[in-house]
Amino acid sequence: MTAGDNSIEYVNPYSLSQTINSDLISILDPNGSTTSIIKPQLNYQIPIFKSIDVSNLIDLNNTKIQTQTNETRINKAKDSSDDHQNNPSSKDYDTSGENIVGGIDDIVEDIKLYVSIDKLKPENFQNQLTTIIINQFPTNLKSNLIEQLLKMLMNLKKFVWSFINHELIDLKLIFIKFDQLKDLKWFLLTYCDHISQLIPNVTIITNDKVNEYLNNNKDSSLAKVEPSKITDNLKAKINLIINNPINYTKGKKNSGTEDLDQVLDSYSNYKVDNNDLIDIPNNMKENIIKDIIRFRSRMLLIEKEQRKKEIEMERIKTKNKLKELFEGIKENSTDSTTRKATNKAAVGVTISPKVSHRDEYEDMNDKEYEEFIAVEERNKLNDQYNKKLKSFQNNQHAEYMKLTNKLKSLQNYESDLIDNKLKYIDNLKNYQTNGLAHLYTHNYSDYLRMRSQKRSLEETKDAEDVKQELEEIKKNGGQVASTNTNTNTKPSTYSSGVSELATTSVETPKSTTTTTTTNDTTDEPVAKKSKLAKEIIIIDLPPTVKQSLQEKIVELVENSLGIKDEFLIQVINENLEASNLDNKQELIDELVQVLDEDAESLVNELWDYIETMV
């Protein structure tokens, strides 16, 4: 055992403070009648190995013993408070020279007068006046002690209280609501100018009209209210509550560094694995282990400080953001009040001008302020007028350009029609060389495939097209007739031309000669359609019409190719947006390379759909 004596030491299982504030109480007690406290005698020690750290166990024992002692004191305090309630005359609110610290143990009792903050919402004007705020109240003071402190201040006055305490608020806001106005007046007369002497840095916030109301009120009970004298006894009790650190709870808000604190606490029992130091000489291991622990602790401390700075910066940013929002709301409310006042003045109602509390308006008198408001309103009206005028001018220019383009297209109608006829002839020639007849001779299988697709498409769509065209003719027959009359054109000619067009669209073209005859016999209807087509501007169409037009383009491409070709859809859209319905033949020429003769039928169907739709 002698060899192991050097590795064993003796420690106390716990280490309590031997004073427990007895010296302080003995000084405060004028009679020096403080009861002696039985001090725990630690006449034994426990042997342990020096390599074992038992500091955490000793602290745990100390906490348990302290908790048991506090519970005993709380139970005694509750019993004494019950006796105090049964005998109210024993309350120490008098000015005699009794024991100053008498009844301090009574401060631990249940909260009875606390209510939630939403219940303090004022329901009438008197509730607004009787509710006050104690600002910058000490943070983390226990709630039961807050109530006991308020009771000391109120001196048996009836009240309820609540508070706001948030992690972004440095100090508490205590809300107090009195039952009667005379209690409020007594409290303000007694403590309004002296509250900071009892509780440091504390201020009382009241309604702006409370002093005026209390002074002008003719109630006899309010006139008899007199302030009370603040006694030394009361000051001593409040100082003991405020300055005792036991009366404060630990902050519950997260600091953001709890994980680092836990790691640092674990370093007291941290051990380095010897397998990691197998290459290090034994005489250097101890110093290296200490260096490792010191280095890691140092890095954790640096990270902890950095994280604290970041959290504090975020807190400041959040605080500033809330302040900016509050200022914005305040300015908006001020602007709305000013606007309402101006509107009432415009109607003819005589109102007293409301002077703004902003710094830039403080040096104005009533007349100057009215002139300032009138100038501001005039500037707003001028701005609105300029915006409306600019919008009108833009719309006027756009409409002028649209009508100018329409006039030019009508003036050049005949030359455009001749050019289109030449393109139609060229298209017919290409159809003779590259159409179905050519496929019928050289590639009969492709001819059958394309012909079957086209026939099925024509059979399903032709009937719908004819039906839609006939309905459009019935609906717009009177309007078309009047238009023809104004332009010195016979209505019968137009009707016969449209009927011929409808008849030829149902029949399947059997030869190129039939197509040529149709073009010759329908020159006048084509001219009318061209006029309508030149009036359509694709970009100016409503969104719903554009959507249906896009669906129609996708449908026609799928029917022609059997698949949805994004490239062809893009080509058609670009042509329509760039030229509207003016370059029909150009679009046909672009699509012929992919669709052959189906390109013309696709474009014709698309043009007919656009004209009927618009």
Curated annotation (Swiss-Prot):
GO terms for molecular function: RNA binding. Residues 69-98, 473-526 are annotated as: Disordered. Residues 73-85 have a biased composition (Basic and acidic residues). It is found in: Cytoplasm; Nucleus. It holds the Pfam family PWI. GO terms for cellular component: cytoplasm; spliceosomal complex. InterPro entries: PWI_dom. Residues 503-520 have a biased composition (Low complexity). Residues 301-327, 450-479 form a coiled coil. It comes from the Eukaryota. GO terms for biological process: mRNA processing; RNA splicing. Residues 490-502 have a biased composition (Polar residues). Belongs to the SNU71 family. Component of the U1 snRNP particle, which recognizes and binds the 5'-splice site of pre-mRNA. Together with other non-snRNP factors, U1 snRNP forms the spliceosomal commitment complex, that targets pre-mRNA to the splicing pathway. Component of the U1 snRNP particle, a subcomplex of the spliceosome. This is U1 small nuclear ribonucleoprotein component SNU71. It comes from Candida albicans (strain SC5314 / ATCC MYA-2876). The lineage of its organism: Eukaryota, Fungi, Dikarya, Ascomycota, Saccharomycotina.
